[in-house]
């Protein structure tokens, strides 16, 4: 067997374990989100707290304060370092984002795409249809806001149509209205800012070179501008942007 053909089982085991951990975290937080909705929590902060604490287990009667502990109560915090801190130290070679499931996307989004520009390019690379398939059932807790922030911070005129397609696909995902209602104030502002940018990108084209709407309609391919504007108006309503 060639040296290059030797399978690195240790690396495969680590990758599998990381994938299983990410999948478990995704399912655990989703379950916590549903529990919080059923409990009719009073505020977004309370809802967020329930989900972020989903990995914690309730203390049993035998667990007494001051007693000798052989296992850390919060296994996700070891010597002042959290699981997320350890996970972000793993920095494999950059590769195109190719998630097969929403759990894959969630893992790669958090581990391999730390910066806004990287996240934005990954969203453009996947495109609206692919994102719609990945999140057909639901967008994970807190993820919708992060997606909107990445789009709002880096959208450019050349990407206007692609971003509209992404927003359209996200709006068709399961429990979209619920996830939209759970956006933080900052995320809502980013969402509003994103649509303001998209509107501004469309307006200059309507008076480009002094052309009338009829003349410009002939210049635009297949009425692309009119279609974008129609879609933008629909999305403004879906995302509840005034």
From Swiss-Prot:
Signal sequence segment: none
Keyword field: Cell projection, Ciliopathy, Cilium, Cilium biogenesis/degradation, Coiled coil, Cytoplasm, Disease variant, Flagellum, Kartagener syndrome, Primary ciliary dyskinesia
Subcellular location: Cytoplasm; Cell projection, Cilium, Flagellum
Molecular function in Gene Ontology: protein homodimerization activity
Effect of residue 154 to P: In CILD17; uncertain significance; hypomorphic variant; reduced cilia beat amplitude in homozygous nasal respiratory cells; does not fully rescue abnormal phenotype in a zebrafish animal model
Entry function: Dynein-attachment factor required for cilia motility.
Coiled coil, from the record: 8-32
Any one annotated GO CC term: motile cilium
Subunit architecture: Homodimer.
Listed GO biological process terms: axonemal dynein complex assembly; cilium movement; determination of digestive tract left/right asymmetry; determination of left/right symmetry; epithelial cilium movement involved in determination of left/right asymmetry; epithelial cilium movement involved in extracellular fluid movement; heart looping; inner dynein arm assembly
Related illness: Ciliary dyskinesia, primary, 17: A disorder characterized by abnormalities of motile cilia. Respiratory infections leading to chronic inflammation and bronchiectasis are recurrent, due to defects in the respiratory cilia; reduced fertility is often observed in male patients due to abnormalities of sperm tails. Half of the patients exhibit randomization of left-right body asymmetry and situs inversus, due to dysfunction of monocilia at the embryonic node. Primary ciliary dyskinesia associated with situs inversus is referred to as Kartagener syndrome.
Recorded family membership: Belongs to the DNAAF19/PR46b family.
Protein name according to UniProt: Dynein axonemal assembly factor 19
InterPro entries membership: CC103 (IPR042422), Dynein_attach_N (IPR031733), RPAP3-like_C (IPR025986)
Keyword Lipoprotein appears in the UniProt entry: no
């Amino acid at each position: 067997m060639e040296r290059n053909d030797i399978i690195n089982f240790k690396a495969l085991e680590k990758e599998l374990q990381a994938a299983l951990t990410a999948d478990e975290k995704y399912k655990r937080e989703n379950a916590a989100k549903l529990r919080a909705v059923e409990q009719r929590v009073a505020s977004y902060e309370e809802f967020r707290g329930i989900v972020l604490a989903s990995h914690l287990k309730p203390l049993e009667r035998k667990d007494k304060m001051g007693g000798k502990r052989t296992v850390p109560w919060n296994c996700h915090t070891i010597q002042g370092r959290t699981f997320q801190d350890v996970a972000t130290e793993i920095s494999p070679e950059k590769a195109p984002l190719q998630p097969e499931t929403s759990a894959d996307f969630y893992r790669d989004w958090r581990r391999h795409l730390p910066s806004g520009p990287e996240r934005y390019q990954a969203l453009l690379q996947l495109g609206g249809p692919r994102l719609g398939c990945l999140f057909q059932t639901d967008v994970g807790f807190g993820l919708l806001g992060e997606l909107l922030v990445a789009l709002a911070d880096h959208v450019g005129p050349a990407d206007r149509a692609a971003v509209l397609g992404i927003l359209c696909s996200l709006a068709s995902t399961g429990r979209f209205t619920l996830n939209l209602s759970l956006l933080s104030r900052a995320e809502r502002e980013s969402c509003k800012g994103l649509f303001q940018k998209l509107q501004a990108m469309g307006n200059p084209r309507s008076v480009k070179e002094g052309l009338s709407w009829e003349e410009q309609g002939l210049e635009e391919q297949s009425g692309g501008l009119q279609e974008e504007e129609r879609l933008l108006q629909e999305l403004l309503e879906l995302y509840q942007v005034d």
